């Protein structure tokens, strides 16, 4: 009958080629799953379906895997290349019939007894048509909803309407030799394999499609019926002298304001639309480390995505990537400012839930929101929220807002019934469409309220935006985190279950800083960010093209030989190709003279490009500081260089969210020094580290590194000088005076970086001084100059230019 099956597959292949578009997950099966396409493969599918086999055939052709239609030859015997757990349902009954897989598997293991060298790869393959999670109340749309083993008539409609949304998901191969060597008879081993396969297919479906959607009334009952919400209703009714019914209606309105209303059909439409937009706007979207997240999902974790926030495009890009990586589309926390017609309704149906900027004083709203969030966690929906609370206007990570993280930890404490992992996500662009409006806001212009016309205007202006980058960071298992930070947290909570734990706030603060460090740990370096860093460090923001290309090559060599982390991504292109690609973005100016090509910043773009430089500033903070130290001292012994780096590192770590501990940073600095010597960015003379010879080609790259850290050091010097002058000063007044003087320095010395006098950056630095005990604090909370801050100021002043030092004396 094999020939008849093959004939049928051939006959239907013509219409199916037009109807079916296959998405293979993952695409790099050799690296992620360890599948070797040179070894015999048997594919294990859930349902014996001709259309599923056709989709599998299309996928294997694109991945270079053996064809599922060709039998596997073993010792002169033929084995089918596909095994199936179930037959399709019949038209008249809902009963699912089992295939003869038990006999096939038993025969396979019997062959192992006859051929000891035999080792087949059994690869489970899950095939999905559409990704509708389903509802408890059925409707007409359920006719085409993908289900386990549908009958042939339903499968016809499924392929007809959902053929373009086919997903072929491969899992790690099972070694038939390993299975055959297990204890037990061939029949027992075969039954074990079948049982495990059934469980695996169920979990794989949950990982891709997610849990069943809640009906609205079920949502109301779950949230409004929670003890905390009922208590909040009673308290508010008592305080406002209204009936419980009135406050209950108010709480119900809060649920409607907050809750998502997910519609898989709209997500599919959005996928098609976004694919066209990405193809028009971006040269490519580079995604790294998605395998880490798939592994978490496969192990049953509740996944919470915490990305950095650069642009409104983040909402779309991350969800799009998650969808195409074969993961459940998350419910997304969005600011209430985005809940305007018609965008709010569209976002809500794509999984967005809305939150107010502040919950302060509104205990009822807080209770409703917290219960809704915990409901999402407990039902198994993945969630995405932005720890910064808003978009970064400078390109740096903002200090984290801890409210959502605190609610997440509180949900875990109350008892989420599966492991919870936070996944940091780094998102980077070579062009952010809002940068011009960010600069206006930094100059004091009021932020424009989001509207449909604003969105329409932005879409109309879409053009070449270069590349987009999305790197998944190192996940944080929250139970393990709490076990490390608060070993007795379970016992403490059991003793006082209704009270907020005293350890919660410090634990949340530690978690928040860890999250931000892990986001930056997964940073993506781009041609745009490298060009911006070099040109902004150059005098008059101009460089010869060959100098720019050489500097970029030097920095790429540095990052490859001494990588900032294993999770950060570095371009594979060389400096010349990166400069050529960056010029196509039309942000740089090119001019010619008799000596060659000069590349400079357009006057209108000079400030805007600080945004892209700031995306990667943390990767070059330590190389820049090393260069500044060696340059200022005109040579220094290695231990002294490391000592000076160690003195300033806690401040850089706090400001730039560098993930390394102090010890790790010192070890990394030592490695950097060796690498910089190897590639010519430093010169070793006996025990002294010196700048490269001024005549060497590497000197300019070294000098630019020194310049890249200067604005940070100048800002440090300004704050410390004001503190020295005042001796004792309030934190608010110190921040205000520091900002005013930084603005003056920027005006007098042509510093075009908005973050040079940004209040968040200055506030973070002053907090870091206090937390690291580099300044004193009086009992009244006043900040005080100290011997330690005096020594720190002296070290910093040695590293900055004399003209800036002279200007500081005028304070």
Curated annotation (Swiss-Prot):
Among SMART domains, the record links this protein to:
PlsC
Q: Name one Pfam family in it.
A: GPAT_C
**Which GO terms fall under molecular function for this chain's record?**
glycerol-3-phosphate O-acyltransferase activity
Q: Which GO terms describe its cellular component?
A: plasma membrane
Q: Which UniProt keywords apply?
A: Acyltransferase, Cell inner membrane, Cell membrane, Lipid biosynthesis, Lipid metabolism, Membrane, Phospholipid biosynthesis, Phospholipid metabolism, Transferase
Q: What are its E.C. numbers? A: 2.3.1.15
**Pathway of action:** Phospholipid metabolism; CDP-diacylglycerol biosynthesis; CDP-diacylglycerol from sn-glycerol 3-phosphate: step 1/3
Q: Which InterPro entries match?
A: GPAT/DHAPAT (IPR022284), GPAT/DHAPAT_C (IPR045520), GPAT/DHAPAT_LPLAT (IPR041728), GPAT_PlsB (IPR028354), Plipid/glycerol_acylTrfase (IPR002123)
What's an example GO BP annotation here? CDP-diacylglycerol biosynthetic process
This enzyme catalyses: sn-glycerol 3-phosphate + an acyl-CoA = a 1-acyl-sn-glycero-3-phosphate + CoA
Predominant cellular place of this UniProt entry's protein: membrane
Q: Where does this protein reside within or beyond the cell?
A: Cell inner membrane
Residue stretches spanning the membrane: none
Q: Where is this motif: HXXXXD motif?
A: 308-313
* Record's bilayer topology term: Peripheral membrane protein
Q: Which PANTHER family match?
A: DIHYDROXYACETONE PHOSPHATE ACYLTRANSFERASE (PTHR12563:SF17), GLYCEROL-3-PHOSPHATE ACYLTRANSFERASE (PTHR12563)
Free-text note on domains in this protein's UniProt record? The HXXXXD motif is essential for acyltransferase activity and may constitute the binding site for the phosphate moiety of the glycerol-3-phosphate.
Give the family this protein belongs to, as stated in its UniProt record.
Belongs to the GPAT/DAPAT family.
Among NCBIfam families, the record links this protein to: plsB, PRK04974.1
Q: What's this protein's name?
A: Glycerol-3-phosphate acyltransferase
